[in-house]
Amino acid sequence: RSPSRGLGDVYKRQEVNRMDFHPKDLKSDEHRSRHPLGRIPVLDDGDIRIYESGAIVEYVLERHKKGNLKPDVSNDNYPEYLQWFHYCEGMVMPPINTIIVQTLLLPEERRDENVLNQARKLLSKSLEPVNQALEGREYLIGNFSAADIMLGHACFMSNRLGCVNEEMLNMKSYVENINKRPAFQIAISMS
């Protein structure tokens, strides 16, 4: 999960530290010095280090104030923006994380097909409100926003994991729109 998938829209001076998405690399002493739980992402900006996805996006938005990716609190779209900004980490990422653990990180003998199937169903169910919200819209609140930075990559991953069903036409279009963004294409090519 990587907010950097969309941060190229705001944060031009980024340097990407690539690493293998493997427990031995994530749990290495070197990486744990950056993130105490051995997870990703991590943002270093001078002497500042942040390792929570939403906090990274909010920090970059406030610190670098480029673009119009966050509506003002007085804007009618602000409550909806806030909803979708936080929906990613609260509702969509937990089942994605379970799917990744069950299919990539755990040794085969420790994987549980029931847990995997339950996570897939939960993910599809969690995406239904997003699909409904996208009716008649290109992006979550109309124009591209930081809510799309947070949720767009999760929807892209959900689609790749086979959890965006064929009836979710709005979601399919949304994933295509996210995938067409130059910053997203650059970030995907680096991963």
Predicted regions and their residues:
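GST-like fold's C-terminal all-alpha helical module
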Residues: 85-180
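Helix-adjacent hinge/juxtasegments
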Residues: 57-78, 84-86
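Short clusters of hydrophobic/aromatic residues that line enzyme substrate/ligand-binding pockets
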Residues: 31, 69-71, 139-140
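Residue-level signal for nonpolar/aromatic packing positions in well-ordered secondary structure
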Residues: 9, 43, 56, 130, ...
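Single conserved hydrophobic/aromatic residue that forms the stacking wall/gate
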Residues: 1-7, 11
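Active-site catalytic microenvironments for nucleophilic, acid-base chemistry
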Residues: 12, 59-63, 157-161
